[in-house]
Amino acid sequence: MAQSSAVTPKALAKWLAELPEFAKSKLWGIGGSCLLQQLGLVLQSRDLDLVCTPAEFTQLCCALSAHLPQLAVSKHPTFCSDYFARFQHHSGIEIELMAGIKVQRHAIVTAWKFEPAQLWHDEQLPWMSPQQWIELYQLFGRPNSVALLTAYCQSRGITVD
């Protein structure tokens, strides 16, 4: 990706979607603050959160590492996903790729399964559903983001469990 002062997480997502490995795979999606921005819930996204199936993780991780430096990731006491990698674009924007998401709280590990069938496409990008990120933000302990997405869904008649 060419250097530019206007690099955004969404612009990085568009660039990634054109890489052969990402273009061939239908088993990854965009979430996190980039999804919140796409839905008009925040003005700016901080980073780019990508979720994929465990089977796709290695291929997509290799594609990212061919273009971007991979950052060291320390073991986290709460977040214990099967697969997790963090990369950094020269603009400073971080890209997190995760699969087999698991969270440990009070000695209980909760696994979350990514469902590619729930993806929706806009601007030729695969977006995760708001409902998926309500579940993830609940697991991650982010009540403000849960509230934003829940209100968004309720205002549009989208069922939230």
Language model region names:
Residues M1-G29, A147-T150, Q154-D161:
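Helical scaffold of the NTase/Pol beta-like nucleotidyltransferase catalytic core
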Residues L16-A55, Q59-C61:
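Active-site nucleotide-donor binding segment shared across nucleotidyl transfer reactions
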Residues K26, I93, E123-L125:
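A structural micro-motif
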Residues K26, S65-T78, A117-Q118:
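Short secondary-structure junctions
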Residues L35-L36, F57, K102-Q104, Q132-I134:
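Short, solvent-exposed loop/turn segments at secondary-structure junctions
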Residues L43, T78-S81, V109-W112:
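Short solvent-exposed loop/turn micro-motifs enriched in small/polar/acidic residues
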Residues P69-R105:
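Conserved catalytic core of two-metal-ion nucleotidyltransferases
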Residues R105-D161:
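Catalytic cores of NTP-dependent nucleotidyl/adenyl transfer enzymes across multiple folds
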